[in-house]
């Protein structure tokens, strides 16, 4: 079954689904005035990663790849946060499965709210 029409759902998060919808990513990030993306993925060698990265760089945005190849550990998350901050990123994008998506969400949260993973997981720091 071919998907001929896409759809968009907006709750507290935005979900966009449909064929070739990745071409809308630069416009969405531009609307939010984002300039430098920490792009979390399983592999920077994925064709989809390369396509989206090209779309972003063609739109004048910088892309910092970050690979998450396993279930993310505290060290993987905190290292991603360190790269996000050191590189001056202002948003995350995730391409991959649950581990990649979860890692990108936590990296972004830590970059904005400060601290490390253990502060929230072990010491009860509120978001």
What function would you assign to each model-found segment?
Residues 75-127:
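Glycine/threonine-rich beta-strand-loop-alpha-helix active-site module
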Residues 1-91:
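ATP/NTP phosphate-donor binding region
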């Amino acid at each position: 079954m071919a998907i001929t029409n896409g759809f968009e759902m907006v709750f507290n998060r935005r979900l966009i689904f449909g064929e070739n919808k990745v071409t809308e990513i630069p416009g969405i990030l531009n609307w939010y005035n984002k300039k430098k993306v920490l792009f979390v993925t399983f592999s920077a060698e994925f064709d989809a990663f390369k396509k989206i990265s090209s779309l972003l760089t063609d739109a004048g945005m910088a892309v910092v790849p970050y690979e998450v190849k396993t279930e993310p550990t505290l060290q993987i998350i905190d290292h991603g946060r360190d790269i996000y901050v050191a590189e001056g990123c202002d948003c995350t994008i995730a391409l991959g499965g649950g581990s990649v998506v979860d890692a990108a969400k936590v990296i972004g949260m830590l970059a904005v709210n400060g601290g490390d993973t253990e502060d929230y997981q072990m010491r009860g720091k509120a978001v």
